[in-house]
Amino acid sequence: LMFDPRVLRQGKSVVSMSVDGVSAGALAVRAAFVFARTRDSAVTHDFSTRPTVPEPDACPPMPENARRVAPAFASHFELRKAGGAFPVSGAREPEFLFWTRHQDAQGVNPMVAMVALADLLPPAAMACFDKPAPVSSVTWTFDLLHGVPPKGEWFLQRSFSRQSAEGYSMQDMEVWDEDRRLVLWGRQSVALFA
């Protein structure tokens, strides 16, 4: 994969960039990034509400049979179910609530580690599957909400499908640190082949 980064616009506080990933002469991925410096503001509020769940030590680890069918990269993380459903459990509510942490993120930029963690949970609509079936991300956008790295090693992740119809699911994702701060918010559209 060859990457071609480009600055699209650079202002005093914000830089907009695009990156194309090309493989065998064909576009494989196109990403857009916006980097912003923190700024003083008279307007400050936070209406986000962290789900009420037990602490990580009180939550069960991911069962071994679920770990066996998870993608290989998931072996680099620890997951503990804090609420919601398990993937492919035939649940009515398309919501995952898991405490997650890296097995080893030594030497990795904390913001890069956070993005990897945010991509860990499967699409929330998979909670409603009664048997395994393919899924494919169509879009994924996220905002890192603080200019400083998140605190702690455990992060509470919530993924909830807002709507699923005609072969696609639209979901929201939240990641909370140990200080109960919302540190990442995302939205994803997913193609469902079930």
Report the location of each language-model feature.
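Terminal targeting signals and extreme-terminal segments of soluble enzymes
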Residues: L1-A194
